[in-house]
């Protein structure tokens, strides 16, 4: 039997939750009718009753605020691996990350089936230098199991003051025992575009992730390559391996640089602002010179937008391994009290109308995970063509004529 005092406590919690739901209804009042459904008052009462039971009967004292925060987290995290409720510290962390630099180990992660999975280590980061790979599962941080209910907690534990160390234990397919990495945190600066001339006429552009400046940085890199070559490029290797994604607009800008026309990406969601189609504008930075795009399991999100746009528009061949398969768009929505909710608001589709979510994009030319030829190891100071077998194969593909042996074939003809 519930006593009078417990009834009062239950009433108080019910009122608090009722006020919150009422405010939510007010917020939704100017939204489309599809979003203005009846609020689940019966479920709200059940929530209040459970909270009251926990407060009264749980073995240890509990904090109302922490209980409600946990309830909110559980609600949002149950949606998909990429949606999350962000408290003040976590929201600040998101803003720091988007600024282009932070102190940490440089790993892009996602939550999948209650496991923290490495999407990709950022190029040049402590994690990349130590050998952490896309697909690794982070099991422990400093010997303590990761919190599989809060991705933000895991990210926060990996970040810290520059120069400090953190021990990360990972599970890797093919390894019987967990692998241990001791990493020294450093300043992670997101320089997203690097370029070099592989040989006369053949350019190489590496995009490590997509930031707000990536489009402009690509334009500058291509101009520099043309200047160093002394003429227009005859082919380009676009390296998107282990690129975890980033800013959607940057991916559209990169795709548009190589397309004369056609759809780049289409997004579909429930609200008008979450539905859009991005189309290419006239002008091809390479004037039709062929492109090979290198991809692997660490190529995700915005990187997959570029790969899909160039492949489906018959502008490039993909070489490597199937991409990660993150075909969704997240929007960070600020809340009162310097908090926010990160929600998946759209699914995006390649120009052919295919959603790559959870399936990825298969390459035109598949390469094994270890593409290095047998023989003595190559010095890190050696030219890229000597130390990266996949880049070498991409250049070979760029040189292969497909019509009558003339070699003077347009990209559209070669890649259909």
Indicate residue ranges for each PLM-predicted region.
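Cleft-lining beta-strand/loop regions that shape enzyme active-site pockets
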Residues: 31-43, 47, 52-64, 117-120, ...
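Short acidic, Pro/Gly- and aromatic-enriched capping/linker segments at domain boundaries
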Residues: 337-346
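Conserved functional hotspot residues or short segments at active or partner-binding sites
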Residues: 340, 352-416
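Extended, small/polar residue-biased N-terminal targeting/export presequences
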Residues: 58-119, 163-167, 171-182, 189-192, ...
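Structural motif
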Residues: 135-137, 354
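Terminal targeting/pro-maturation regions of precursor/exported proteins
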Residues: 2-83, 116, 414-416
């Amino acid at each position: 039997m519930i006593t009078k005092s417990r009834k009062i406590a239950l009433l108080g919690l019910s009122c608090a939750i009722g006020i919150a739901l009422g405010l939510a209804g007010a917020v939704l009042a100017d939204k489309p009718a599809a979003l203005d459904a009846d609020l689940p008052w019966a479920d709200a009462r059940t929530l209040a009753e459970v909270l009251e039971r926990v407060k009264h009967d749980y073995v240890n004292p509990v904090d109302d605020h922490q209980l409600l925060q946990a309830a909110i987290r559980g609600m949002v995290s149950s949606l998909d691996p990429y949606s999350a409720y962000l408290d003040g510290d976590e929201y600040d962390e998101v803003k720091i990350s988007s600024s282009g630099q932070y102190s940490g180990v440089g790993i892009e992660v996602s939550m999948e089936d209650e496991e923290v999975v490495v999407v990709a280590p950022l190029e040049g980061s402590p994690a990349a230098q130590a050998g952490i790979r896309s697909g690794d599962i982070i099991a422990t941080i400093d010997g303590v199991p990761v919190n599989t209910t809060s991705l933000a907690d895991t990210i926060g534990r990996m970040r810290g003051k520059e120069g400090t160390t953190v021990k990360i234990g990972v599970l890797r397919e093919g390894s019987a025992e967990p692998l241990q990495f001791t990493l020294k945190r450093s300043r992670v600066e997101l320089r997203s575009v690097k370029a070099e001339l592989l040989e006369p006429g053949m350019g190489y552009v590496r995009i490590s992730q997509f930031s707000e400046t990536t489009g402009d940085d690509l334009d500058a890199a291509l101009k520099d390559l043309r200047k160093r070559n002394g003429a227009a490029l005859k082919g380009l290797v676009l390296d998107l391996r282990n690129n975890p994604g980033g800013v959607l607009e940057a991916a559209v800008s990169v795709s548009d640089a190589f397309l004369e026309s056609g759809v780049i990406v289409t997004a579909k969601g429930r609200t008008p602002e979450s539905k859009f189609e991005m189309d290419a504008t006239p002008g091809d930075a390479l004037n039709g010179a062929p492109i090979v795009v290198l991809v692997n399991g660490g190529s995700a999100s915005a990187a997959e937008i570029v790969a899909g746009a160039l492949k489906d528009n018959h502008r490039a061949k993909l070489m490597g391994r199937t991409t990660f398969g993150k075909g969704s768009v997240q929007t960070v929505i600020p809340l009162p009290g310097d908090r926010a909710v990160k929600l998946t608001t759209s699914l995006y589709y390649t120009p052919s109308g295919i959603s790559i979510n959870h399936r990825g994009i298969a390459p035109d030319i598949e390469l094994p995970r270890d593409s290095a030829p047998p023989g003595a190891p190559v010095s890190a100071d050696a030219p890229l063509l000597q130390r990266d077998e996949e880049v070498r194969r991409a250049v070979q593909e760029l040189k292969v004529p497909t019509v009558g042996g003339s070699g003077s074939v347009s990209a559209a003809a070669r890649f259909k």
